[in-house]
Regions:
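Ribonuclease/tRNase effector modules and their secretory precursors
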Residues: 1-83
Length: 83
């Protein structure tokens, strides 16, 4: 897994509990995914070790270089609409 310098030097320093394995799993099997206006991609997944809280992993536009990761307390799983 590729990471940015910002992720290695800032994110992991601020949130040392974040495991790279969690990020890899979320990228491989996201619960949800969204492309931001700037081209970066948000991936969400649920982490048992965080009490099944949602973890947001943001990658660069390539979809594989991790730039940010943090617990996302505002994440709402997508709901299906019935027409």
């Amino acid at each position: 897994m590729k990471t940015t310098r910002y992720f290695r030097e800032q994110v992991l320093r601020k949130r040392p509990y974040i495991q790279l394995e969690w990020c890899e799993k979320i990228l491989a099997e996201p619960a949800a995914k969204m492309v931001q206006a700037d081209g970066r991609i948000r991936f969400w997944g649920f982490v048992p070790e965080l009490g099944w809280r949602a973890l947001r992993v943001v990658t660069l536009a390539d979809g594989e270089t991790v730039h940010k990761a943090f617990p996302d307390r505002d994440f709402k799983p997508p709901t299906e609409r019935v027409s």
